[in-house]
A protein has these predicted regions:
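Class I SAM-dependent methyltransferase Rossmann-like catalytic core
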Residues: 1-45
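Conserved SAM-binding loop of SAM-dependent methyltransferases across substrates and taxa
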Residues: 56-68
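Short glycine-dipeptide loop
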Residues: 69-70, 150-155
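Glycine/threonine-rich flexible loop motifs
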Residues: 124-135
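Class I S-adenosyl-L-methionine
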Residues: 163-207
């Protein structure tokens, strides 16, 4: 029975991998963002989008489809990730560490972003508590950046491993946005502790 469940999960993951390859996306993670977007309507034509931890690029590819030619895309990741990515039309790719990057570098000439995305996950150690703590630190930094660069009314999506501070971080999103939702996409592994926390309608930096 256990082997059958493992086989089912492997087939399921492979199905999304093959679908992404067939449709020209850089990774199966694209279907997580697609499902989130279908549930909450993240994007509008012409939006300015910041993707934190953007490699290998499937979320930027999906965002491009949603915001159209007039939209602006900015992606940030570590050098090893950026260097391995294929060129993305109309996207500005920045090489750097999300924990130390300067906000001015992210914004460039823009007054702000309409959507901030983060599919960042830590390099897992296999130690559950350590991985949760690292995920929480990445999520907290992504939220901090979103609070600094989002325009009023903007949206945020961040991946978070469920851990001791999960509720506290969700409350931080509730205080920052008009609406907060959590989504566990169908393309996520059933045994995964990841959740996507969504903030809709940024209240503004002074609220």
């Amino acid at each position: 029975m256990a082997k059958n469940r493992l086989d089912d999960r492997g087939t399921r993951r492979d199905r999304f991998h093959q679908k992404a390859k067939k449709e020209g996306f850089a990774a199966r993670a694209v279907y997580k963002l697609e499902e989130i977007d279908q549930k909450v309507s993240l994007f509008e034509t012409g939006d300015r989008v910041l993707d934190l931890g953007c490699a290998p690029g499937s979320w930027l590819q999906y965002a491009r489809q949603q915001v159209g030619e007039t939209g602006i895309l900015v992606g940030l990741d570590r050098p090893v990730g950026i260097n391995a990515m294929k060129a993305l039309p109309h996207a500005r790719l920045l090489s750097g560490d999300v924990m130390t990057v300067k906000l001015e570098e992210l914004k460039g000439e823009l007054s702000g972003f309409d959507v901030v995305l983060s599919d960042m996950a830590p390099d897992t150690s296999g130690i559950r508590s350590l991985d949760q703590s690292r995920s929480e630190a990445l999520f907290e930094r992504a939220l901090e950046i979103a609070q600094a660069v989002l325009s009023p009314g903007g949206n945020f999506v961040g991946k978070l491993f469920q851990g001791p501070d999960f509720k506290k971080l969700m409350e931080a999103v509730r205080l920052t946005f008009d609406k907060m939702k959590t989504v566990k996409p169908a393309s996520s592994r059933q045994i995964s502790i990841e959740q996507y926390v969504v903030g809709l309608g940024f209240k503004g930096a002074n609220k």
